[in-house]
């Protein structure tokens, strides 16, 4: 059972339920909306939404388009008409797998990484959308599962949950990682096309702009975020909660010269990724990434978002 209810600060509510009589229905509606195969793929006034779910999700605030073989084709902020989706490896809702093969030995290969998170000969693989499943469609939310073919995994899917009457999207990556001795990482892009926004995270309870509000000469490649990240603008801002994965990577998805922090504003405009899995640091992390995992996120719009 799902429903929406608004609460004032410190307000308490008691909910109860009771059996309701079944709603009356017409045996014959004279409306063609579903065929004998029980597939609702007919455009009709009776059901305007179900026939479109294999291609897109939409509410008052967002439009998400997707196509098998093409992946995510659109992530639209409807109020402004702005396309939030970025290209290449920054495409939202699309998982990435990166692998550096062991060509010497496991320790020497990791030493040669230096400050980079991948080797000079690393390869990055982007998930390819191969199937779409409608899990739930109701008056409160709709859930759609996007199945991706992703190197290094036996299963990879992203479940989108869009609320009908809230400016909020929840999304979950489900992954079955295969066994490999290579240096590996799994990412989910969190970059949005908001060039005027400032990117904030909370680190140690303190809001900061990565690449700007940190010590000169310090690392800018990866960060630990207490709760997630915020794209802050003068009006409406976008909050992304990284509920299960505090590690973020910022920068190009390739081996590159390392620039230490010089506090320039441009540092805050770099691509950002949720760094879900890695076995880069063998002293701190599990070397074997194989197994099943589920990692949840939530994106929502906020008006005049403060930093505390």
Regions from the PLM with identified roles:
Residues 1-308:
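C-terminal (or distal) subdomains of carbohydrate-active enzymes
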